[in-house]
Amino acid sequence: MIIITAITLIFSMLISQDCSPGYTEVNELCFHDGDLSVIQKMIDNSYVSNIDLGCEDWDNYCGSPNPYMDDQDSWFWVTVDSVYYEWAGNNNGIVEPLELGIQEWNNGRLTSLMCGAYIYCQLSGPIPEEINQLTEATTIRLEYNYLSGFVPETLCDLEINENDYLQFDLGGNRLCPPYPSCSGEGGDFWYQDTSACTEISDVNFDYSTNILDIILLVSFVVEETYPDYQQTIASDINSDGNLDVLDIVEIVNVILEVD
């Protein structure tokens, strides 16, 4: 019995996967840390958004992200180097990166993330600015989730055909204008629910432009505090790519016109 156990241990060590630096081993497979971190950010943004989907206690599919993806009976899968793996959840109560949607990986890099219609990832919150780290991705489908906020310009760093909705689709979310040129705006299937979007100049996102926005904008201009991407877009009143005194003048004019 001891000999059999020893042989099994040695065999396991021989076939185990040694991942290169910058990669994480999961189930003896290697996954790029940067790609995993972007998916994790999507999940984190969804949890932090606290979106109200009107969930009932009995509904195991309701939540953002979809809690069913963490269920051991979930039907989602991951393809790694053309090999199909049924990737059931681990039932720990938290959706983890490799449990989200339908994914394809090649040589440790994410090449496809399917999280759109009929997959029901139910993502919410903003698209991570770090999405440009998915440098090997050729398919990103995020249509008909609950994504909100401004679309990061970094999305345009990716080599994805935004005109092919089978490769890339952001439609049917709650994303706010202005949209970058690579967003797919103007396509046949483009639609966004902008009813909850605030105006550029609403720096603190309280649905009103007032003295509080000026105070926050000044703190950005003098570098007392540093804006995140969403705040940067809302603060660049004149859309010149800089936060400076000209934006302060513009926001004052906005307030005076409102009054």
Describe these PLM feature segments.
Residues 2-16:
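Sec-dependent N-terminal signal peptides
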Residues 14-122, 127, 159, 172-201, ...:
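N-terminal capping/linker segments that flank leucine-rich repeat
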Residues 34-41, 126, 150, 213-216, ...:
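Extracytoplasmic/secreted proteins, especially bacterial periplasmic and envelope-associated proteins
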Residues 108, 132-135, 156-163:
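Inter-repeat linker/turn residues at the boundaries of leucine-rich repeats
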Residues 111-116, 138-142, 166-170:
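Conserved hydrophobic beta-strand positions in leucine-rich repeat
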Residues 122, 131-140:
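Extracellular repeat-rich scaffold modules on cell surfaces
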Residues 130, 150, 154-155:
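C-terminal per-repeat helix/turn "cap" of leucine-rich repeat
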Residues 195-259:
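Cellulosome-associated attachment modules in secreted, modular CAZymes
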